[in-house]
From Swiss-Prot:
It catalyses: UDP-N-acetyl-alpha-D-muramate + L-alanine + ATP = UDP-N-acetyl-alpha-D-muramoyl-L-alanine + ADP + phosphate + H(+). Keywords: ATP-binding, Cell cycle, Cell division, Cell shape, Cell wall biogenesis/degradation, Cytoplasm, Ligase, Nucleotide-binding, Peptidoglycan synthesis. It comes from Bradyrhizobium sp. (strain BTAi1 / ATCC BAA-1182). The keyword Nucleotidyltransferase does not apply. ATP binds at G114, T115, H116, G117, K118, T119, T120. One of its GO terms (molecular function) is ATP binding. The keyword ATP-binding applies. This is UDP-N-acetylmuramate--L-alanine ligase. It is an enzyme of class 6 (ligase). PANTHER family: UDP-N-ACETYLMURAMATE--L-ALANINE LIGASE (PTHR43445:SF3), UDP-N-ACETYLMURAMATE--L-ALANINE LIGASE-RELATED (PTHR43445). One of its GO terms (cellular component) is cytoplasm.
Length: 467
């Protein structure tokens, strides 16, 4: 039995979240009656309303009246009035991942997991399958620029989804093809230990059926170790690693783009196949690596070399992933979601490759607990920035932690040898500081998962206003 067509309304609590909105949009496009609520209006809510979905602002008990099922994200607390009412009325309550799993049962599925790079890799797989005439359904954790949304309903037999590991529910997802980009210590508030994180990723891959396969990056030592532990499943490895089945070679930066080739090597026959002259309109080895994962899947699904080349060359990127927001006097402003030390280091390395000028990082640390647990890593991930401007911690609902704040972070960066670190007193001061530091040819990279994206989009005009 699959999700009955007559079920509904399906009510989403927190429908404006990036993961929830994508599922709601696809369900609506499939013909289900969808409604929801969110704490505030946002761009996702506006887009859903344009599709005819009723969205209430504010969480109230009466919002769930008439609902057949209530979908909640992990951000929704047990005392939420809509959740409490649903349970009191014995309305079935399902987690976001459980509803996503129901959608995945309707198609063959590629699920992309990893601590970093999921959203970009998901978008790349979608672009390649699209180019190959497969017309996939897509549910992503970020806005795909080519679609203007994070979700689309395709007519083909495949679905491409981002598998969010943050609360462990990605283990519910029935993937036929699994990608693992990397595994780093993250979401320890849920998993408690890094060993538990690794066990979850191992289980994710082992959930793939015998007729499916997993694509895993052995440039990452933890992933390579996982490959050695997984038996009875077909694994395709990728990376610059000389032992990879799908190898990224001859990578070179070119005016904000990346040029490379990919070599496939069959372990049984030893035969090789090469796709040369690949151009990705994004800088950074991490993005080329993500593209290699997507290419590995596309090649395995029978998509031609020429279609692969064309799709990668035309890849439009993802919102908040090295997104150019504007320019002022030859200074380029970039907005990026990077908020983990590994992500920040990769973004700044890409920025360094993209300019002969200075790289000025503006960072808004996201969550006190993340800054606390990864403090040493945060203090050493800004080496490719000529200057670092540090804003207050974005709490994301957390209470402050003594000794974990902007000023201690500034001191930590200086103590670890960084030559130019400044505290940002308040957001209104950013334009003045950037004007003083930046010259033509420089890149200003705004980093964080909080509201720093608003600063990044406002900054070009604020700089122009200063003259």
């Amino acid at each position: 039995m699959r999700l009955p067509r007559e079920i509904g309304p399906i009510h989403f609590v927190g429908i404006g979240g990036i993961g929830m909105s994508g599922i709601a949009e696809v369900l609506c496009n499939l013909g289900y009656t969808v409604q929801g609520s969110d704490a505030s209006d946002n761009a996702n809510v506006a887009r859903l309303r344009e599709k005819g979905i009723t969205v209430s602002v504010g969480h109230k008990a009466e919002n769930v009246a008439g609902a057949d099922v209530v979908v909640v994200s992990t951000a929704i607390k047990r005392d939420n009035p809509e959740l409490m009412t649903a349970r009191a009325q014995r309305i079935p309550v399902v987690r976001r991942a459980e509803m996503l799993a129901e959608l995945m049962r309707l198609k063959s599925c590629v699920a992309i997991a990893g601590t970093h790079g999921k959203t970009t890799t998901t978008s790349m797989v979608a672009a390649l399958l699209d180019a190959g005439g497969i017309d996939p359904t897509v549910i992503n954790g970020g806005i795909i620029n080519a679609y203007g949304t994070n979700a689309r309903l395709g007519a083909g037999d495949w679905m491409v989804v981002e598998a969010d590991e943050s609360d462990g529910t990605f283990l519910k997802l029935p993937a036929d093809v699994a990608i693992v980009t990397n595994v780093d210590p993250e979401h320890l508030d849920h998993f408690k230990t890094f060993d538990a994180v690794q066990d979850a990723f191992r289980a994710f891959v082992e959930n793939v059926p015998f007729y499916g396969f997993a694509v895993m990056c052995i440039d990452h030592p933890v992933v390579q170790a996982l490959v050695g532990k997984i038996e009875d499943r077909r694994i395709i490895t990728y990376g610059v690693n000389p032992q990879a089945d799908v190898r990224l070679v001859d990578l070179s930066p070119a005016n904000g783009s990346s040029r490379f080739k990919v070599v496939f090597r069959d372990r049984k026959s030893g035969a090789t196949h090469e796709i040369s002259d690949i151009t990705l309109p994004m800088p950074g080895r991490h993005n080329a690596s993500n593209a290699t994962a997507a290419i590995a899947v596309a090649h395995e699904l029978g998509i031609s070399d020429e279609a692969i080349r064309k799709a990668i060359a035309g890849f439009g990127g993802v919102k908040r992933r090295f997104t150019r927001t504007g320019e002022w006097n030859g200074v380029t402003i970039i907005d990026d979601y990077g908020h983990h030390p590994v992500e920040i280091a990769a973004v700044l390395k890409a920025a360094r490759e993209s300019t002969s000028g200075k790289v000025i990082a503006v960072v808004q640390p996201h969550r006190y607990t993340r800054l606390q647990s990864l403090f040493e890593e945060f203090c050493t991930c800004f080496n490719d920035a000529d200057a670092v401007i540090v804003a207050d911690v974005y709490p994301a609902g957390e209470a402050p932690i003594e000794g974990i704040d902007r000023d201690h972070f500034v001191l930590g960066l200086r103590a670890h040898g960084h030559r130019d670190v400044l505290p940002l007193p308040q957001a209104a001061d950013l334009a003045g500081i950037v004007k003083r530091l930046a010259k033509s040819g420089d890149l200003v990279v705004c980093l964080g998962a909080g509201n720093i994206t608003q600063w990044a989009y406002a900054l070009p005009n604020e700089l122009k206003a200063l003259g």
